[in-house]
UniProtKB/Swiss-Prot annotation:
One of its GO terms (molecular function) is manganese ion binding. GO terms for cellular component: cytoplasm. Mn(2+) binds at residues 13, 201, 203, 237. One of its GO terms (biological process) is L-leucine biosynthetic process. Homodimer. Pfam families: HCS_D2, HMGL-like, LeuA_dimer. Residues 4-266 form the Pyruvate carboxyltransferase domain. It is an enzyme of class 2 (transferase). This is 2-isopropylmalate synthase. Keywords: Amino-acid biosynthesis, Branched-chain amino acid biosynthesis, Cytoplasm, Leucine biosynthesis, Manganese, Metal-binding, Transferase. It catalyses: 3-methyl-2-oxobutanoate + acetyl-CoA + H2O = (2S)-2-isopropylmalate + CoA + H(+). Its main location: cytoplasm. Catalyzes the condensation of the acetyl group of acetyl-CoA with 3-methyl-2-oxobutanoate (2-ketoisovalerate) to form 3-carboxy-3-hydroxy-4-methylpentanoate (2-isopropylmalate).
Amino acid sequence: MKQILFMDTTLRDGEQSPGVNLNEQEKLQIARQLERLGIHVMEAGFAAASEGDFQSVKRIANTIQNATVMSLARAKESDIRRAYEAVKGAVSPRLHVFLATSDIHMKYKLCMSKEDVLDSIYRSVTLGKSLFPTVQFSAEDATRTARDFLAEAVEVAIRAGANVINIPDTVGYTNPEEYYSLFKYLQESVPSYEKAIFSCHCHDDLGMAVANSLAAVEGGALQVEGTINGIGERAGNAALEEVAVALHIRKDFYKAEPSMTLKEIKATSTLVSRLTGMVVPKNKAIVGANAFAHESGIHQDGVLKEVTTYEIIEPALVGESQNLFVLGKHSGRHAFTEKMKELGYEFTNDERDAVFEAFKKLADRKKEITEEDLRALMLGEAAFAAQQYNITQLQVHFVSNSTQCATVVLKDEEGNVFEDAATGSGSIEAIYNAIQRILGLECELADYRIQSITQGQDALAHVHVELKEGAHQVSGFGVAQDVLEASARAYVHAAGKLKSFIQLVK
């Protein structure tokens, strides 16, 4: 049975989702979780895009030990050399070079002839191969490319040294039958086909990204590309967790097994959702809140008698816990540390102490601490520790009618303390106005969302905000049992990012 490898592009293609803006620390958190998920290749970013992207890719490359780290590059020497500088420190570095091959792209975007495109492919892959042990070539807009020319371009790339050939459905145009036949066509028409691994990369514009990816596997693809939760530009990418579980459950049909640690799927999905602020729909396959819920009386009766009557996936397969009690206020530092290690977290003594302190505070107010609570605490404290500013004091007072007054005290990384107060028509508006006064911002609150992480009156709150000032838009999140504290943390998280961006462009 063939093993299907996964190339995750959450950190590059996924981050291109409108409204998503991850900082370096957040990208590193996701990269570490992708490593736990067993992802074979992670596309850490586009190193030549900006200095920030370069530094993020470089840090991930120097950190990850058990996965290939890849940078995207155009078919340009400067891009390729920049990608090399970013990932050369990786245990397993890879270059991902791309060039469009469809008539519409060659005519209107590239203004290049077919001969020019073939020459550029050969030169860029040859250069890449002189620097990297592994080179992946993508024929952008492959599914709208004339098949004979696509086969010619692929052959040129393989002869130049490409180890992996990606056939992307860049605009989500194809369907499963067409995509399957395209892979079969290339198998028959590319003389050097056996010298490379073929990969698929599907977008979801027509809602067929997962189905198309599975069809590609049937057609001979050995690598599937996509993102966690299917996030990405426009309608998004193929959701890797859906492809992986489909291959596992229907290995009898696909004759393939996913190379992924499936029990880490839920934790990965939750992390990506909270850091990006993109809420997972309740009815989403595999990771949605209702994925394993049954309301129909007939269904409930069947499941109680025999679970396989209406469930084809065991929740535990993807790491869906039953949210059972795991720790309490009497749990000590050692038990806490061991449980966090069991969940896959590694941290320094200082980081452990900060999260343990937050855990003890929560345990004093919450009778049962679940795995979801622990993950949320770890996420929240990691974000809090990485911020330019942290909240040291927060007070809200009723003034009159609906007017509230908030006093906020912030401390920066150098230990400087800032305090200010402001009013607003409600507690949250007052808090946000006070924070704006401290940071000297005049931004617009573009989005505010609150989620309960676990059930019950003592549940942790997760608040996501998006701030906009001029052309700059950033997101932030905060986790706390108190909604006002979570809201303040989220605003400080986002406002700190926004201030950094504004200072950078100045």
